[in-house]
């Protein structure tokens, strides 16, 4: 079975990139994935570039793309199709400030199994606390939570429904949360969260994990205020304590 490509987009916070790569390896079944790192012009200094190159040299990632631009959350990741070495039914997109849970079976095999069972799902991501477009729809008893849009929280994409090669310039100037999800919906596919696969996100950290001198580099984070929080049943697994996403009145 070909390895599923996991595309990690990084922007500063090297400690998060280190943790993200490490925990993917620690929490994903060996031989089932390959990691591709795409950096948004945040590794200009020699130490950071050497760190990124060492990940490649040590075999921790399959490919490395150091972009000379900061594309932010704009979805111009058409470069991904140049990075992958396999052709699989699904691929995964995430950011360096999102960390996977430790589950049995592992998170990747669970998400693939969900996609295999639900041929109508085009985008499937790990759960986060409710946020804007990611607010779920209620009333469905299923292993997924249907919603308006999902972000890059280990977002699994059905390649046949939205192949990487189909990214057009008009799609590359918009945030991925809304536009890619809407485009997938227009193609008749569902957009969902996993019901029982949650992740840890830097939004749960003060200033999203940025050092004081880095906050101003990402204007989206300057006015975010206090980090969002939710309770964990088991911090190692990042599972919810209750089904409030579906049962909230």
Residue map of PLM features:
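A short, glycine-/small-residue-rich helix N-cap motif at loop->alpha-helix starts
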Residues: 68-77, 172-174
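Conserved catalytic core of nucleotide-sugar-dependent glycosyltransferases
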Residues: 72-74, 99-169
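Short beta-strand-to-loop acidic/aromatic patch adjacent to the donor-nucleotide binding site
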Residues: 88-101
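Acidic donor-binding segment of Leloir-type glycosyltransferases
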Residues: 25-68
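Cell-envelope/extracellular polymer assembly enzymes that use nucleotide-activated donors
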Residues: 3-5, 179
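Active-site nucleotide-sugar/metal-binding loop of Leloir-type enzymes
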Residues: 77-90
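C-terminal catalytic/acceptor-binding lobe
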Residues: 143-144, 149-151, 165-249
């Amino acid at each position: 079975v070909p390895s599923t490509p996991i595309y990690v987009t990084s922007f500063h916070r090297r400690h998060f990139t280190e943790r993200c790569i490490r925990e993917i390896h620690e929490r994903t079944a060996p031989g089932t994935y390959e990691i591709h790192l795409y950096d948004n012009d945040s590794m200009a200094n020699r130490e950071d570039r050497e760190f990124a190159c060492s990940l490649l040299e040590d075999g921790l990632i399959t490919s490395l793309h150091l972009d000379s631009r900061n594309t932010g959350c704009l979805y111009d990741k058409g470069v991904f199709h140049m990075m992958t070495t396999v052709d699989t039914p699904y691929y995964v997109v995430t950011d360096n400030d999102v960390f996977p849970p430790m589950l049995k079976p592992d998170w990747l095999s669970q998400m693939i199994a969900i996609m295999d069972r639900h041929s109508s799902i085009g985008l499937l991501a790990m759960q986060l606390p409710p946020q804007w477009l990611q607010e779920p729809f209620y009333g469905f008893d299923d292993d997924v939570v249907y919603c308006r849009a999902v972000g890059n929280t280990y977002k699994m994409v059905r390649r046949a429904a939205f192949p990487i090669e189909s990214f057009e310039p008009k799609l590359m100037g918009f945030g991925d949360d809304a536009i890619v999800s809407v485009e997938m919906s227009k193609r008749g596919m569902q957009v969902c969260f996993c019901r029982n696969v949650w992740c840890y996100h830097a939004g749960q950290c003060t200033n999203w994990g940025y050092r004081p001198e880095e906050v101003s580099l990402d204007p989206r984070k300057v006015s975010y205020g206090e980090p969002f929080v939710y309770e964990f049943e088991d911090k190692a697994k990042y599972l919810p304590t209750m089904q409030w996403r579906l049962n909230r009145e």
